[in-house]
Amino acid sequence: MAKTRFEWDTKKGQENEDKHGVAFGLAQFAFVDPNRVIAEDLSHSSNEKRHYCFGLVDDGVLTVRFVYRGDVIRIFGAGYWRKGKQIYERENQVHKRTPRKA
């Protein structure tokens, strides 16, 4: 099986880290989550198909925006966003615990 390769623009990576607090090097780990969710970004896929990966990283659900370029995954955005967490939990049927009444 071929090993997945990741790439990104270093300037864009630094901008993302400054703005959202997530390095693209960390974002790669969302793809390792066996329960990750991959979805096509239908609202921004005009010239090339863009995708989201929602995966658990460091006890939070990380949303990674990326494109496939041959056998390479090119990351162009990442952050811990509520909507990504909601999608991840819905697709994995994760339910919040409600405290029991005594």
Label the predicted regions:
Residues 1-102:
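Ribonuclease/tRNase effector modules and their secretory precursors
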